[in-house]
């Protein structure tokens, strides 16, 4: 029985869904869990990445291959077919297609996953585009027979930039849960497609994995310190603050997590 099922979702392509899915699958697998990565995007980016990585020059196939299973399932019936396919896996991660072009497939993935992660850069346009994703999640809740949680993963963040803190405040004010860890803008991530995962970039993704485990404790049987997703979601849009002006939101500033955890868990 799957312990954690996660879908990466967004309205548009190019938001970091595939990158997030592959790196997360890698760190979960490195921690000793059985991982299934589901490529639900008709473009097959995750599967292509896997194929290219396995042929990486200078490495034997067994060294270059991803340390987890990957299957292609771009289907509107994903939520019906995946339980049998994933019945022996501890973690299932679904790389969904962009909702604007493949809504049926994306909805099927949202019906299956217990946690929905929305990758989002700290920019006004990307924050505003999370609203249709939230609307899809709300519709899916009506037809599910078990709870679903959702959170935003801030990615492509510039170190010490105010935009990251402003984006977190705006998202919280809009009613979202935002993971404590942010993914910085690094070349190791931007240039990682088609090559084996480099351990030098895994530190951040281990922290993201810890955040997810804490959030999903009620579903996965792991102790959680994450807050509940209760409360309403205001249907507002974010406007960036003017230079020198006050923040447009009243949410408390949350400092992004940095540095490795000292908990002694496999995610450190």
Where do the PLM segments sit?
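Long, low-complexity, intrinsically disordered segments
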Residues: 235-268
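Conserved C-terminal guanine-recognition region of P-loop GTPase G domains, centered on the G4
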Residues: 130-145
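Structural beta-sheet core signal
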Residues: 36-37, 94, 118, 152-154
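Inter-motif core of Ras-like GTPase G domains
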Residues: 104-124
């Amino acid at each position: 029985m799957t312990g954690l099922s996660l879908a990466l979702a967004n309205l548009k392509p190019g938001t970091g869904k595939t990158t997030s899915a592959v790196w997360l699958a890698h760190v979960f697998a490195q921690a000793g869990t059985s991982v299934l990565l589901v490529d639900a995007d008709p473009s097959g980016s995750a599967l292509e990445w896997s194929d290219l990585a396995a042929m990486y020059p200078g490495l034997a196939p067994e060294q270059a291959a991803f340390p987890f299973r990957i299957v292609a399932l771009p289907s509107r019936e994903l939520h019906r077919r995946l339980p049998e396919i994933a019945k022996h896996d501890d973690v299932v991660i679904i790389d969904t297609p962009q909702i604007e072009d493949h809504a049926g497939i994306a909805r099927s993935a949202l019906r299956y996953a217990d946690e929905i992660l929305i990758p989002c850069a700290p920019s006004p346009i990307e924050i505003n585009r999370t609203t249709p994703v939230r609307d899809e999640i709300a519709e899916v809740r009506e037809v599910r027979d078990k709870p679903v949680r959702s959170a935003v993963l801030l990615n492509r963040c510039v170190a010490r930039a105010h935009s990251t803190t402003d984006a977190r405040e705006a998202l919280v004010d809009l009613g979202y849960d935002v993971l404590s860890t942010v993914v910085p803008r690094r070349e190791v991530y931007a240039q990682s497609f088609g090559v084996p995962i480099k351990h030098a970039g895994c530190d951040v993704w281990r922290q993201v994995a810890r955040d997810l485990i804490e959030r999903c404790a009620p579903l996965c049987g792991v102790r959680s310190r994450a807050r509940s997703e209760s409360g309403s979601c205001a249907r507002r849009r974010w406007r960036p603050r003017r230079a020198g002006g006050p923040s447009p939101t009243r949410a408390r500033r949350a400092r992004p997590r940095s540095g490795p955890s000292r908990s002694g868990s496999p995610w450190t």
